Amino acid sequence: MFFKSLLRYKWYALSSLLMTSLMIASSLLLPWFLKHILDALQEQNSQTIYSMGGWLIGIGFVGLAAGGINVTLAAYIAQAVSSDLREETFRKIQTFSYANIEEFNAGNLVVRMTNDINQIQNVTMMLFQILLRLPILFIGSVILAIVTMPSLWWIIFLLIVLIAGLTAVMMGMMGPRFKKFQTLLDKINAIAKENLRGVRVVKSFVREEDQFHKFSQVSDELLSENLYIGYAFSIIEPMMMLVGYSSVYLAIWTLSGMIQAEPGLVSSIASFIGYLSQIIFTIIMVGFLGNGVTRGIISIRRIKEVLATEPAMAFPDSPDEELEGSLSFEHVTFSYPNDDEPMLKDISFEVEPGQMIGVVGATGAGKSTLAQLIPRLFDPQEGSVKIGGRDLRELSQGTLRKNVSIVLQRAILFSGTIADNLRQGKLNASLPEMERAARIAQASEFISRMEESFDSAVEERGSNFSGGQKQRMSIARGVVNNPNILILDDSTSALDAKSEKLVQEALNKELQGTTTIIIAQKISSVVHADKILVLDQGRLIGQGTHAELVATNDVYREIYETQKGKED
């Protein structure tokens, strides 16, 4: 996944590798030229001093220029790769079913698309700017240091063993900690998101302190975990520096006796110290970058987990079809993910094209669940749902969206314009089509009063509209494509009785050939339906006209009489 994204920018990556090679060559050659300059100083060979000095300065400038170019290349690659991964992750999430979303939860997915992608961007920047350079520079410096002073090989070996041990301990300690840190980050993001969405409820019941306490608990856990990681790295980095500088002291202590015995070794010793300094530099950088690299690796795994997830529902790749509006449930049993108890149990019924069907029942009876099976937001565990005699699992996603439209109880609007929101129902909806949909939904009145009409702005979550206005726009979005089956999931609950009646009259007049499924809390909303389905604890316990059910169905009659009594 990560390397596949890198391949799209292979020429930038290869250019970065070339610059890295020049930087490494510059770093490895500088101590070698320094050795020869010192030898020339001892021999008082001015010609060699000038020529080698010129090479030294030239190579230094090449390394500096290569470093500057490489920073630009690394920044471009990191931003491009992270942008591609963010888009790929978002595109993948768009294919997820409700079950997939519930598996991760929305807050978790938001963190993965933001924080985790940022971590990947950082580690990509590190990779091309520093990480690719470190191992080659380390190996090259080790080899040249040993070649320069073979008798001091044991100092290099001891240094490598100690650093390898420290790195192994660090990775073993930090891996689980970073994973827990990301989990807590997901959790605190979910709490914040939930609180902001439900801010009216929080303030209505004066629960600010409770919400703060809940947030504070997770925040304290997150702080504790972050502090542990910080403390660990604050110990590991100085330890690596201590090991590195101890090796320099050990080398100087050993070399001091050698210089007294053989003064001509000064140039070799200076070169050796130069290479040893580069070895220590790579060690310190490993300690310094370990935090970011470990986080980046975990973030790559988390993004890979999303991209590797197969959608819970697959749609056949077939041409879009026009279907008649008949609907049938055949022995349908359904339970939500992670729920043991079925929400719907052995449901069977048939609907003829153009009929109006009401669905009633107590809260939790399964009305909305039944509605969500019709546009195939979920698949039943048993039985089948058919439209036009065709099993939903045989239909392409385009066919379903073309023929079936659902208007949910909770009116969800997207930031943009009114036209943008209506075109969620039909991508290329014309102005006359939107005006017709608005008339049906009784939204024309307030839209026409707005200065920019259908081009008027919709703020985030439709916060600049009332509940009734949002619900009417949601209904308009549902009818704009003139569907063969329209599902209204208690979608007139925010409307007054007059507006609700006008919407129903407009639906009957304008969508005469459309099969309409109305999920209702109030029986008055479906009293004129061709057929009413009565649900109770997930079972279909009755179906018929209003008059038939009042006469024969105890549950329906009880609901009707209770509501009638309240109205009286």
Question: Locations of the language-model features?
Answer:
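A short amphipathic helical element positioned immediately N-terminal to and/or at the very start
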Residues: 1-8, 109
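Hydrophobic alpha-helical transmembrane segments of ABC transporter permease domains
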Residues: 7, 18, 26, 30, ...
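An intracellular "coupling" helix at the cytosolic face of ABC transporter transmembrane type-1 domains
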Residues: 8-10, 95-99, 115-124, 128, ...
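Transmembrane helix-loop-helix hairpins at lipid-water interfaces of multipass membrane proteins
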Residues: 7, 13-69, 73, 146-151, ...
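ABC-type nucleotide-binding domain
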Residues: 323-568
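Helix-loop-helix
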Residues: 44-48, 58, 144-158, 228-302, ...
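Short intracellular "coupling" helices and adjacent cytoplasmic loop segments at the cytosolic face
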Residues: 43, 79, 87-111, 115-117, ...
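Juxtamembrane helix-loop junctions of ABC transporter transmembrane domains
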Residues: 18-19, 26-39, 59-106, 110, ...
